Swiss-Prot record:
Principal location class: cytoplasm
Record GO biological process: pyrimidine nucleotide metabolic process
Keywords in alphabetical order: ATP-binding, Cytoplasm, Kinase, Nucleotide-binding, Transferase
UniProt catalytic activity: CMP + ATP = CDP + ADP; dCMP + ATP = dCDP + ADP
Organism whose genome encodes this protein: Lactococcus lactis subsp. cremoris (strain SK11)
Name of the protein in its database record: Cytidylate kinase
Keyword Nucleotide-binding included in the entry's annotation: yes
InterPro entries in UniProt: Cytidylate_kin, Cytidylate_kinase_dom, P-loop_NTPase
A GO cellular component annotation in the UniProt record: cytoplasm
C-alpha cells in the first residue's frame, strides 16, 4: 500500500481538523495538526508576553511540540505540559493570525512539518499545506463553508467545552480572520491549483469524510 500525503486546506472552522482526524484513524495515517502548532506558538507569545519570533522559537525548541493519543482523542503537548484545551481559547484564536504570519515562525514550523511528513502516510490540515508545506501531496482538498455555518460550529464546540461564547461576535471574528488570512504577505490562504474544492455548507462530517476517503483510496 502506497504511503500517501493528504493536504487539507481551508478557512477557520471549516471542519478541516475534525475531518482529518477521522480520516487518519480510518485509513491508518498519521495526523499532524499544523493549526495546533501555530496555536502553540501563539500561546507561548501570550504567556511569555513577547512578539519576538526568535524568543518564541527558542522556547519551543527547548519545549518541543508533540502529539499523543489520549482518552478523548489527540493531545497536544509542549514539553511535558498538556495544552490541548488552552490553545483553543478565544484569546489564542484571535491572536493566531498575527503570530502565524511572522516569517521566522512559519519557516520554523514548515521545516518541522516537512521533516515529519517525509516518510509519507500522513494527513495534514492548515492554510497553506497544499501550496507551501506539501506542494507534492498526492491529494489536496480545499474545504470551505459559509461564515454562518462555521460560526455555528465553533459556537457549539465552545459551549461543549464550557467556554462562554457570543454567536454574533464569533461571526464577526471569523469573517475578520478570513480577511487577515487571505491578505497576509506570508503564505496567504489560497487554493492550490491542483486542489479539489469542497464546500461543506449543509453537509455532514460523514459525507465530507466519505468523499475524501474515496479519493484517497484510489491513490493508495
Amino acid at each position: 500500500m502506497k504511503k500517501i500525503q493528504i493536504a487539507i486546506d481551508g478557512p477557520a472552522s471549516s471542519g478541516k481538523s475534525t475531518v482529518a482526524k477521522i480520516i487518519a484513524r480510518n485509513l491508518g495515517l498519521i495526523y499532524l495538526d499544523t493549526g495546533a502548532m501555530y496555536r502553540v506558538a501563539t500561546l507561548v507569545a501570550l504567556q511569555e508576553k513577547t512578539e519576538d519570533a526568535s524568543k518564541i522559537i527558542q522556547f519551543i525548541e527547548n519545549h518541543p511540540i508533540s502529539f499523543a493519543n489520549g482518552k478523548n482523542g489527540q493531545e497536544v503537548l509542549v514539553g511535558l505540559d498538556n495544552v490541548t484545551e488552552v490553545i483553543r481559547t478565544n484569546e489564542v484564536t484571535n491572536a493566531v493570525s498575527k503570530i502565524s504570519a511572522m516569517v521566522e515562525i512559519r519557516e520554523f514550523m514548515v521545516a518541522e512539518q516537512q521533516r515529519i511528513a517525509q516518510k509519507g502516510g500522513i494527513i495534514m490540515d492548515g492554510r497553506d499545506i497544499g501550496t507551501v508545506v506539501l506542494p507534492q501531496a498526492n491529494l489536496k482538498i480545499f474545504l470551505v463553508a459559509s461564515v454562518d455555518e462555521r460560526a455555528e460550529r465553533r459556537y457549539k464546540e465552545n459551549l461543549s467545552k464550557g467556554i462562554p461564547t457570543d454567536l454574533e461576535r464569533l461571526k464577526v471574528e471569523i469573517a475578520e480572520r478570513d480577511r487577515k488570512d487571505s491578505i497576509r504577505v506570508v503564505s496567504p490562504l489560497k487554493q492550490a491549483e491542483d486542489a479539489i474544492l469542497l464546500d461543506s455548507t449543509g453537509k455532514t462530517i460523514k459525507e465530507i469524510v466519505q468523499f475524501i476517503e474515496e479519493k484517497a483510496k484510489k491513490l493508495m
